[in-house]
Structures are given as C-alpha cells and as structure tokens.
Amino acid sequence: MKNFTLLASIFAALLFVGCADSSSATPKSSKARFQTVPASQAILVQKGENRESCVICGMNLPTFYKTSHTAETKTGTKRQYCSLHCVVEDNEINKTDLVNLKVVDTNSLKLISVYKAFYVVGSSKPGTMTRTSKYAFAKKSEADTFAKEFGGKVMNFNDTYTVSMKDSYR
C-alpha cells in the first residue's frame, strides 16, 4: 500500500509539473542588451553563411551591433566585428592590413568613418569584449549628451584605439 501511495504521489507531481504553463516558469528579461538591435536594422557588410558573425570571435553582430565596426582588407574583402577589441586583435595580432574602417553610430545605426566619429569611452553602458565600453557618435553634441547621462569621456578614434589596445593586452 505504501508503494502504491508513493507511486501515485510521484505520478500526480509529474502530471502537475507537466501541465504547468512553461512561460511562467522562466521569466524573460524585459530589458534587451543596450548594444542589440533587431537583425532587420543591422547593416551587415559581409557575404556568405556567417555574415551575421564577428570574423574574430564569432559573436552575433545584431546582438552587439551598437559597438560594431567594419573594415576592408587590401584585397577588398569586407570584414565586420562585434567590437573595437576584435578590430585591434585582427589588426595588431593577426596583422591584417585593414583600410576603410567604419563604426556604427549609436543613434542612427548607420556606418560612419571611425575618423569622423566621437567615441564615448568608459560609460555605464556595458562594453563588448571589454570592461571599458566604447560607443561612437556622428555628432559631438550627441556624444556629449550620452556622456553626460551615462558617464565616460569623449575621445577621437586614435585615442579610443589606444585604450582598446591597452585593454587587449591586460
């Protein structure tokens, strides 16, 4: 009789668990990553099966789009990265000769020249592949507004690249 009661209890528990609404079992975060955009809004420059992946680390580009950079090799191959960290790795460690570097403007989501961008370095928003966040803006006024709200320092590309190199070699 004890075995029957035990089996009946186990069966009832399994039946109860199996009928539970699974959507309430695992609450979903109401906040997406700051870096993320819908795939339909991401400008992807690479061709082929892995066009949505960073060429260095493989991370999903729409997920980390607001920190994405693009470049071309001397032979004209277009490459896209999830972060400046991966650009530095490709350029400095892999010795890939990169030209025509661009970065995503955090506000418009368009690609702009890294040399015309204003980077906010070290804001409270999360970085990609680094503890020190780096977000780019087409207009200095937009970078200043972002830095005022989320902290960080407004820098040009060369200074931001130097910070990223130091982060990479820690």
Task: Mark where each language-model region is.
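Bacterial N-terminal signal peptides that target proteins for export
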Residues: 1-8
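C-terminal partner/receptor-binding element of secreted or periplasmic proteins
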Residues: 138-170
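Mid-length scaffold segments of soluble, non-membrane domains
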Residues: 72-111
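Residues immediately within or flanking Cys/His clusters that coordinate Zn2+
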Residues: 51
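Short cysteine-rich clusters marking metal-coordination/redox-active sites
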Residues: 54-57
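C-terminal motif of bacterial Sec signal peptides marking the signal peptidase cleavage site
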Residues: 15-18
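Bacterial signal peptide processing site
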Residues: 20-22
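Cys/His-rich metal-chelating microdomains
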Residues: 60-61, 89
